[in-house]
């Protein structure tokens, strides 16, 4: 079974995280939420409290097929300030496995140089932070092992794009119906 990790930082965009997790789980992808702090309790950008499946130090990330960053502020900035998150993203990318980010979070990938020469999209206003990317403004961009999404209103597009990489056609039909 495929495995996806959705990182949660305080201030994350709730729709982007829960929508993505829901779509991937419906597609039969083993999807875990992981707090980037030592506390499983994470507060979203709109003050909704979530309990992550694990903390960063409690889970093995080495076999994840996809590492996913929801946006939201200050969540995306908190992800960007986490050296352990950035280290695993770089390793994942180097190994050719999926790194994905939506809304403001593609700035993390841009800052790591993972968008150089790739098509990418993000929430309006964050385009300058997608260093080296060809910013398209599309709902979702899939360029090699990098997936980016524009924002919360397009979370279904983002989640489906990720699921299409990992699920069979019959399962795909169930997820989108």
Residue ranges and their predicted role:
Residues 12-16, 41:
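Short N-terminal binding/cap micro-motifs at the start of the first secondary-structure element
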Residues 148-164, 168:
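Conserved anion/nucleotide-ligand pocket segment
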Residues 31-96:
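Flexible gly/pro-rich beta->alpha loop and the following alpha-helix that scaffold active-site loops
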Residues 20-29:
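A short, Lys/Arg-enriched amphipathic alpha-helix followed by its capping loop at the start of a domain
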Residues 1-5:
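Extreme N-terminal starter segment of soluble prokaryotic enzymes
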């Amino acid at each position: 079974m495929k495995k996806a990790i959705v990182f949660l930082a305080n201030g994350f965009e709730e729709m982007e995280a829960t929508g993505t997790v829901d779509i991937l789980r419906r597609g039969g992808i083993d999807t875990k939420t992981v707090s980037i702090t030592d506390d499983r309790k994470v507060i979203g950008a709109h003050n909704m409290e979530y309990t992550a499946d694990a903390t960063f130090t409690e889970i093995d990330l080495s076999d994840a097929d996809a590492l996913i960053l929801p946006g939201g502020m200050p969540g995306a900035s908190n992800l960007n300030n986490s050296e352990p998150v950035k280290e695993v993203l770089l390793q994942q990318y180097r190994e050719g496995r999926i790194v994905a980010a939506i809304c403001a979070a593609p700035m993390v990938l841009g800052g790591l140089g993972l968008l150089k020469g790739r098509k990418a999209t993000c929430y309006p206003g964050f385009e300058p932070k997608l260093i080296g990317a060809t910013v398209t403004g599309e709902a979702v961009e899939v360029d090699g092992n990098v997936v980016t999404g524009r924002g919360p209103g397009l979370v279904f597009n983002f989640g489906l794009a990720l699921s299409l990489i990992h699920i069979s056609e019959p399962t795909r039909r169930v997820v989108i119906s």
